[in-house]
């Protein structure tokens, strides 16, 4: 039991979220670099002479230099076992991103120092805030011209509604960026070396040391730094309970590309962020330190290894210890099973694991029995973890196979990719699945879907973008749904569960359609438990 407590206590499982190009994937790579998981940090943008970033594993990601699927990476650092959930940073992300946040115990929010809080940051922050998990802020790209640090703190508080506490303070920005002041240790960290591919050296020196003015090449800069730090000291105090409740975000400044502030951030973050949190199930709260194993499926990914045509279900372990070949119980399937090939991943690279603990993420071979949100327990326990949210799609496309002889592959491909949660599939009532309406949260998923159907299933698609922006469930209608009076701004659809829905070209069209059809009642599907 003491080993179980020790192993779980050293786990840290967190997601990294950001707006596109804020430097999230670069920061992830530097964490892996410091943890010894990789010897050289990859450069994200596609350059022929520089390898692709470790977390960007799908072929389309390597070509575009963006992350479009959520990767899972584990490494060891200073006695901690770290599980990073790397979410897509592209503007058009998917439900996969939201679901990945359900598996995290905390989040690192990466903000571009020049741009501040951007639209996608707000979306992802909202999902984290919904779960009340601790959120840590890393203000990146301080080696470029950036906003005033005080303005950035104000912006985070104003835009996101969370209080902030600066853990360190930048020394200059842009060409003048020379390091950070660590408030907890009350010392300056000067960094030498600008190569993003090597670990940065650091020089520690007291803030009031006369040498600081010489190192900064200016007494004025030294005085400004002292004034800033003293002003911070007169402000809000650090409150760990507020951090744990997701009400206060510790803020760190640095530069992922040039390594400024990365290692101090990682060390402080690991001390502040919590070990695996308790999770809510239908029988109550499950303690992560319980000896009984339990987990839930938060992601399904097909064809991670094209040669094997495999499908992996990613499970977040919530309590106890997992042991390879032990007998477990699939609650939704109501049957016992052995998970004989459990794998831990570094993006697309995998290795078989014999044991894993609460906080860890493992991938298990899925012949098609798992669904997102499923619970796995030890035999004799039949509780279910709270469902994983599904989010209403915002973009729609009519899709069919160009070659009608590829019908079987088309149906299989669309169903498998939909089961992963990247797309949602609808059809016109009474029709088959030879032609479907695909709904997504972000339009990049259309490109990914088209690419994967061709690359993995050998099916070229005919795709017609539809003008719809809103979707509603039909709750009530006194007549036959096929007799609905619909104009060109609405269409009747059916989902895989057989539920009837309407899609609309605008928010205004919803009210107009309801008025044209007395007795019609519809409702939003903003967040539904999956």
Which residue stretches match the model-derived regions?
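Structural and coupling elements of P-loop NTPases
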Residues: 1-530
């Amino acid at each position: 039991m003491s080993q179980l407590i020790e192993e779980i206590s050293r786990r840290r499982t967190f997601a990294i979220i950001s707006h596109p190009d804020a430097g999230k994937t670069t920061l992830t790579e530097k964490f892996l670099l410091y943890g010894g998981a990789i010897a050289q940090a990859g450069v994200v943008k596609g350059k022929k002479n520089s390898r692709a970033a470790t977390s960007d594993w799908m072929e389309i990601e390597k070509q575009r230099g963006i992350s479009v699927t959520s990767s899972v990476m584990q490494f060891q650092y200073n006695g901690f076992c770290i599980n990073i959930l790397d979410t897509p940073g592209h503007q058009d992300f998917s439900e996969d991103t939201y679901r990945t946040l359900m598996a995290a115990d905390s989040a690192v929010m990466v903000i571009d120092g020049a741009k501040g809080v951007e639209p996608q940051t707000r979306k992802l922050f909202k999902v984290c805030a919904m779960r009340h998990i601790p959120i840590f802020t890393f203000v990146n790209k301080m080696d470029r011209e950036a906003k005033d640090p005080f303005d950035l703190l104000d912006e985070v508080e104003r835009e996101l509604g969370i209080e902030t506490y600066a853990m360190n303070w930048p020394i200059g920005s842009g060409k003048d960026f020379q390091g950070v002041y660590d408030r907890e240790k009350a010392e300056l960290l000067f960094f030498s070396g600008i190569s993003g591919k090597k670990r940065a050296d650091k020089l520690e020196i007291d803030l009031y040391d006369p040498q600081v003015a010489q190192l900064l090449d200016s007494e004025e800069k030294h005085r400004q730094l002292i004034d800033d730090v003293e002003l911070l000291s007169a402000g809000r105090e650090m409150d760990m309970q507020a951090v744990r409740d997701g009400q206060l975000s510790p803020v760190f400044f640095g530069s992922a590309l040039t390594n400024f502030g990365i290692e101090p951030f990682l060390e402080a973050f690991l001390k502040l962020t919590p070990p695996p949190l308790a999770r809510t199930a239908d029988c109550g709260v499950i303690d992560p330190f319980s000896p009984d194993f339990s987990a839930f499926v938060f992601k399904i990914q097909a064809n991670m290894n094209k040669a094997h045509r495999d499908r992996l279900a990613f499970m977040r372990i919530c309590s106890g210890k997992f042991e390879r070949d032990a007998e477990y119980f699939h609650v939704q399937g109501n049957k016992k099973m052995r998970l004989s090939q459990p794998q831990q991943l570094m993006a697309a690279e995998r290795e078989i694991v014999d044991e894993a603990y609460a906080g860890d993420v493992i991938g298990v071979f899925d012949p098609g029995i798992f669904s997102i949100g499923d619970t796995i327990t030890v035999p004799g326990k039949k509780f279910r973890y709270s469902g994983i949210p599904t989010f209403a799609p915002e973009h729609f496309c009519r899709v069919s196979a160009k070659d009608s002889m590829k019908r079987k592959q088309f149906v299989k491909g669309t169903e498998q990719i939909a089961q992963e949660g990247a797309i949602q599939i609808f059809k016109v009532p009474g029709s088959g699945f030879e032609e479907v309406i695909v709904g997504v949260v972000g339009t990049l998923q259309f490109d990914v879907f088209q690419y994967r159907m061709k690359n993995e299933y050998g099916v070229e698609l005919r795709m017609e973008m539809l003008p719809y922006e809103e979707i509603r469930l039909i709750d009530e209608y006194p007549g036959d749904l096929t007799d609905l009076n619909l104009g060109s701004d609405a269409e009747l659809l059916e989902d895989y569960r057989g539920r009837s829905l309407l899609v609309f070209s605008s928010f205004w069209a919803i009210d107009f359609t309801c008025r044209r059809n007395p007795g019609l009642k519809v409702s939003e599907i903003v967040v539904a438990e999956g």
